[in-house]
Amino acid sequence: MTDLRSATGPYFGDFGGRYVPESLVAALDELAEAWEELKVDPAFIEELKELHRSYTGRPSLITEVPRFAEHAGGARIILKREDLNHTGSHKINNVLGQALLTKKIGKKRIIAETGAGQHGVATATAAALFGLDCVIYMGEVDTERQALNVARMRLLGAEVIPVRSGSRTLKDAINDAMRDWVTNVETTNYVFGTVAGPHPFPAMVRDLQKVIGEEAREQVLALTGRLPDAVAACVGGGSNAIGIFHAFLDDADVALYGFEAGGDGADTPRTAATITKGRPGMLHGARSYLLQDEDGQTIDSHSISAGLDYPGVGPEHSWLSDLGRASYRPVTDDQAMSALRLLSRTEGIIPAIESAHALAGALELGKELGPDSIILINLSGRGDKDMETAGKYFDLIDAGAEQS
């Protein structure tokens, strides 16, 4: 197999690139140049590693879940516990690196987009830690379904701006954040949350998330004496997935599975299964798979999960799909919520709805691969933020009761 781990962008096969207004080219050049220097700078590497040790709580644990696995044909299932990180998800891995970079290039203000609010919370957290001004753009639909995370961001000192244009979700939040960056590029760094967007974001965010797979590869080897048969993760933009996939890309015997948000079903209009149902196009400065109409216009996505409700996907995932190195499958809202409840009741771990898509996919995967197989799942976040959605979905909240 070719050395897939060495891909650095700006292109991943036919995907990626940088299709942006002239006004952003200088900022992206500055960012790319700074990252190329810092990613091999021993002092920066050590400072980030120490931050992760003392602040994030890395390395994150792995947890085998045998009672859950009984429902997956008896396969051994091991979770990589990114839900245990400070702020509750994998997002902090990327944000601390980008916030540290912001300090190094002398900028005082950071902006970010957020869907589920996890990237926004992580960005607001890093801004508080480093003394940076912080503005978060969040679709109005998402501010309503993730109100808890909005409160967290504001408590941390960030300004949260609800985006009322378009579908009022993640895609529109990115559009407004990009507009802010164009206007304020001298003072502001855009802390992008996933492995999409224009170069250098897909490669840089991947570089900052690949710690997940590097740790997990060693941990699974130590626990089981061999590599897993399959690695599974949910895919929206795709940063948690590429983070765990990357260490295994050149291990030909390890199958990689990305589980997309199927919404009401991949064959319905209400879906976010971008690789399953989309075709190549341009969005947010890069070429990748997109959900689009016959005229090439991006169409609205749907998922019960705010973090997967995005009509695009990272260019490296598009490339891995075309190469056949990774497989991408849709998981419906109902399948994800069922898996969320199953993990909660069999193992006492409440996952984020995003992560529950990977859990649901792995239940089917285990039946395909059989009882001798080992499946590693990236549990990308915890479910605290989703209690209102889960409470309504499963009718868990007493009528008239107020949430405390």
From Swiss-Prot:
Tree of life domain: Bacteria
Keyword Lyase in annotation: yes
Pathway given in the UniProt record: Amino-acid biosynthesis; L-tryptophan biosynthesis; L-tryptophan from chorismate: step 5/5
Gene Ontology MF, one: tryptophan synthase activity
Cofactor: pyridoxal 5'-phosphate
EC number(s) on file: 4.2.1.20
Catalytic activity field: (1S,2R)-1-C-(indol-3-yl)glycerol 3-phosphate + L-serine = D-glyceraldehyde 3-phosphate + L-tryptophan + H2O
CDD domains the record matches: Trp-synth_B
N6-(pyridoxal phosphate)lysine modified-residue sites: 91
GO CC terms: cytoplasm
Pfam families on file: PALP
Entry annotated with the keyword Secreted: no
Keywords from the UniProt entry: Amino-acid biosynthesis, Aromatic amino acid biosynthesis, Lyase, Pyridoxal phosphate, Tryptophan biosynthesis
Subunit record text: Tetramer of two alpha and two beta chains.
Homology family: Belongs to the TrpB family.
Listed NCBIfam families: trpB
Function of the protein: The beta subunit is responsible for the synthesis of L-tryptophan from indole and L-serine.
Protein name: Tryptophan synthase beta chain
Gene (UniProt): trpB
